[in-house]
Amino acid sequence: MSVLKVIEVLGNSTVSFEDAVKNVIKEASKSVKNIESVYVNHMYVDVKNNAITEYRVNTKVTFKITHE
C-alpha cells in the first residue's frame, strides 16, 4: 500500500506557463522526493504596458510518502 501527500506550490516564469510548471517541479524536488504528478489549479499572467511580463501557476504537487 502506498500513501500519497499533496502540497500547494506556486511557480512563475518570464518565458511561459510550461516553464513555470517546470520551475515548480525543479524547486519542489529540492525538498520533496517521489513526485508523482502536478495538477495546475490556476494560471495567471502579470501585464505591463499591454505585454505579458510574467506567467504564474498555482499547482498541487502529489508525492509518495516513503519510510526509510
Please identify what each model-predicted range represents.
Residues M1-S2, E68:
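Compositionally biased, disordered extreme N-termini, encompassing classical targeting presequences
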Residues L4, V38, R56-N58:
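Structural motif
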Residues V38-V47:
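Short, conserved loop-to-beta-strand elements that form functional interface hotspots
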Residues V24-I25, V47-I52:
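Noncatalytic linker/hinge segments flanking ATPase motor cores
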